[in-house]
Structure formats: C-alpha cells, structure tokens
A protein has these predicted regions:
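Short amphipathic recognition helices of helix-turn-helix/homeodomain-type DNA-binding modules
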Residues: 75-82
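Conserved hydrophobic/aromatic packing and binding residues within compact polymer-binding modules
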Residues: 22, 36-37, 47-50, 76
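DNA major-groove recognition helix of helix-turn-helix/homeodomain DNA-binding modules
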Residues: 60-75
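Recognition helix of helix-turn-helix/homeodomain-like DNA-binding domains
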Residues: 41-55
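Short basic helix-loop element that most often maps to the first helix and adjoining turn
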Residues: 20-39, 64
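A short, Lys/Arg-rich alpha-helix, primarily the initiator
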Residues: 2-28
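Short alpha-helical elements of helix-turn-helix
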Residues: 16-19, 44, 58-63
Length: 82
C-alpha cells in the first residue's frame, strides 16, 4: 500500500476528488453558517470546514445538509469530470 502525505491534500470546493457548492447554496438560502449548523444538527465548525475544503462530509451529513437546503446532494457535492 502506498503512503500519502495527507497534509498536502486539499479537500473541498476545488479538490480533485470532490467539487463543493455548499457556501453558494447556503448564501442563496440566506442562512449563516450558524443557522445552517443548527438546522442540520452539526457544529458550525463542521460547516466552515466543509465550505473551506478541510473536511468532506459523511453521507449522512451530506443528506442532512441537502435536506435543510431543500436540494439534492448532487447539487452541493459533485465528482469532477475526468
């Protein structure tokens, strides 16, 4: 198994493995990070980390956020085209 230096991997809106539109959808819904975090039952720090590409959400969290923002998970998070 090959070792990867995780400090050099940037996840999130411009990560090569996941494109992230959360901040745009949150702002369109006129929600602060705090308001979204309360509605999605997650910490504000988690929302911030997702938006800033530090954290890729679990399937359950992605579903909670998309339900809160009344959109599909695929609207928020997409795989980049090859």
């Amino acid at each position: 198994m090959r070792s990867t230096n995780l400090k050099n991997i940037r996840m999130g809106r411009d990560h090569q493995k996941l494109l992230n539109n959360l901040e745009e959808f949150r702002k369109t819904a006129k929600l602060t990070q705090e308001e979204l975090s309360v509605k999605a039952e997650v910490s504000r720090k988690s929302i911030n980390a997702i938006e800033n590409g530090v954290y890729i959400p679990s399937t359950v969290l992605a579903l909670k956020i998309s339900k809160t923002l009344n959109c599909n998970v695929e609207d928020l998070f997409q795989l980049p085209e090859d």
